[in-house]
From Swiss-Prot:
Gly residues compositional bias, start-end: 504-517
Annotated organism of origin: Botryotinia fuckeliana (strain B05.10) (Noble rot fungus)
Protein's name according to its UniProt entry: ATP-dependent RNA helicase dhh1
Gene for this chain: dhh1
Keyword Transport: yes
Motif extent (DEAD box): 196-199
Biased composition (Polar residues): 432-455
Length: 538
């Protein structure tokens, strides 16, 4: 009997038809992004994420994030970061730097240890929200808790959150120093110290705070610095605080290959009319329009609305809850155009943005580089248009020289193959809903409208009302969201006009528009502009 059982056991083969890749079958992988990509992200060594010998649970998060193969910066940084060595990494905007430090951080964290083990510093609140969402999505199968904290929010909520296990803190330096200084955030076992947009974090306004934060970390911590530009302040910090850092420099050229740059000479009083002409002629999926001051941001947003286009705006003087809401809604495609200051030049990744317009030309090359990097993300196509006044001509020349790039005069017709894809509906949206606060992000009666491509920008009526009223207009009427954003129902397609980009009437102080609506308040109880009534019958 025993011999018979032994014979049967020897003949038994364990085979559940499993294959090495079978575990991928149950993953919730988003649709493949079929858009053309440039060498900024395709010039790799041919590695796969599996080649890094990371946990399967982390691989599951990577593939469910929509990643297929590592980009050049990820190929270079991830293996080194996994060894615990300090890193100085320089790579272009929009080439995957965030995942290059988040993936090794998630791999090295011990979920059973309830102490903070990784600190990720970023310069802006919006970038903190975005980075924390990447951490949560990539680490969703690991049981790792991520906390985001920034200035402008209540300290009480952060204190309560830190009473629970937190493995990664993502935030701005001032708030984290405040928490550490009050002995609320225990960084004694935080072995990973990461700075994204390191050049900004090591500017004079942040340097002292960064130096103080380092005192709360163990001496054998790992420091990783990532940025597109490395000024002398970064070298000074590295020499003082980093041990034999591994240097990565993938900046063979400063600008992204997929971005086409143009300029148009425009008198100040004609800029709004020029912008109107661009809207009518360009095939915009989403656009970001930059101004050099917060006052001009609000004024331009109101003028764009008077012209009949849906528009949000955002700047540093706004209430934090309103900034979060605008960022969340624009990221999810509720509106086509965003007017902002340099608040959103750092790290913000919105795949659907294919046009960046510098309504006000920046004063230096670094700001220009980060602005235009909001389009053409992850090797895709983008368009940057600069409205140049007579006073800007020397800045234009200096920026071209410093960046080693060419900004060409704008042609009468911009070929669509420079910045337009045939199927914009396939452009990836955020993997998960960017809920920063349930009460802020879930207004009733709101339509989540995905922008679609048209021959010109979508024109809608606009009237400034209360942002939070959540009312929806009937067909052909205006839907408005006053605090920082205006949007309309009943789109009217603009078929384009025979105009030059830099000629015509209208100015920043008085663009064309239809009937004027009631004057109401905008953000922060500031004085609002005149709304645009329904367009007159043609």
């Amino acid at each position: 009997m025993a011999d018979e059982l032994a014979t049967k056991l020897a003949a038994t083969q364990i085979n559940d038809n499993a294959s090495p890749d079978n575990w991928k079958a149950g993953l919730n992988i988003p649709a493949k992004d079929t858009r053309q990509q440039t060498e900024d992200v395709t010039a790799t060594k041919g590695l796969e994420f599996e080649d890094f010998s990371i946990k399967r649970e982390l691989l599951m998060g990577i593939f469910e994030m929509g990643y297929e193969k590592p980009s050049p910066i990820q190929e270079e940084a991830i293996p080194v970061a996994l060894t615990g060595r300090d890193i100085l990494a320089r790579a272009k905007n929009g080439t995957g730097k965030t995942a290059a430090f988040v993936i090794p951080a998630l791999e090295r964290i011990n979920p059973k240890n309830t102490k903070v083990q990784c600190l990720i510093l970023v310069p802006t609140r919006e970038l903190a929200l975005q980075t924390s969402q990447v951490c949560k999505t990539l680490g969703q199968h690991l049981g790792i808790n991520v906390m985001v904290t920034t200035g402008g929010t209540t300290l009480r909520d952060d204190i309560l959150r830190l009473q629970e296990p937190v493995h990664i803190i993502v935030g701005t330096p001032g708030r984290i120093l405040d928490l550490a200084g009050k002995n609320v955030a225990d960084l004694s076992e935080c072995n990973m110290f990461v700075m994204d947009e390191a050049d900004k974090l090591l500017s004079p306004e942040f340097t002292i705070v960064i130096e103080q934060l380092l005192q709360f970390h163990p001496k054998d911590r790992q420091i990783m610095l990532f940025s597109a530009t490395f000024p002398m302040t970064v070298k000074d910090f590295s020499d003082k605080n980093m041990a034999d850092p591994y240097e990565i420099n993938l900046m063979d050229e400063l600008t992204l290959r997929g971005i086409t740059q143009f300029y148009a000479f425009v008198e100040e009083k004609e800029k709004v009319h020029c912008l109107n002409t661009l809207f009518s002629k360009l095939q915009i999926n989403q656009s970001i329009i930059f101004c050099n001051s917060t006052n001009r941001v609000e004024l331009l947003a109101k003028k764009i609305t008077e012209l009949g286009y849906s528009c949000f705006y955002s700047h540093a003087r706004m209430i934090q809850a309103n900034r979060n809401r605008v960022f969340h809604d624009f990221r999810n495609g509720v509106c086509r155009n965003l007017v902002c200051s340099d608040l959103l030049t750092r790290g913000i990744d919105i795949q659907a943005v294919n046009v960046v317009i510098n309504f006000d030309f920046p004063k230096n090359a670094e700001t220009y580089l980060h602005r235009i990097g909001r389009s053409g993300r992850f090797g895709h196509l983008g368009l940057a248009i600069n409205l140049i006044s007579w006073e800007d001509r020397f800045n234009l020349y200096n920026i071209e020289r410093e960046l080693g790039t060419e900004i060409a005069p704008i042609p009468q017709i911009i070929p669509k193959n420079l910045y337009v894809y045939e199927t914009p509906e396939n452009i990836p949206r955020p993997v998960s809903n960017f809920q920063t606060n349930t009460r802020q992000a879930s207004g009733p009666g709101r339509d989540q409208q995905q922008p679609t491509q048209h021959s010109g920008n979508q024109r809608t009526g606009g009237q400034y009302n209360n942002y939070n009223n959540g009312r929806q207009s009937g067909p052909g009427q205006n839907q408005s969201q006053g605090q920082g954003q205006v949007q309309g129902q009943g789109p009217r397609q603009n078929q384009g006009q025979r105009q030059n980009y830099s000629r015509g009437r209208g100015g920043f102080g008085g663009g064309r528009g239809g009937g004027q609506g009631p004057r109401q308040n905008g953000y922060d109880n500031s004085r609002g502009g005149r709304g645009q009534g329904p367009p007159p019958a043609q």
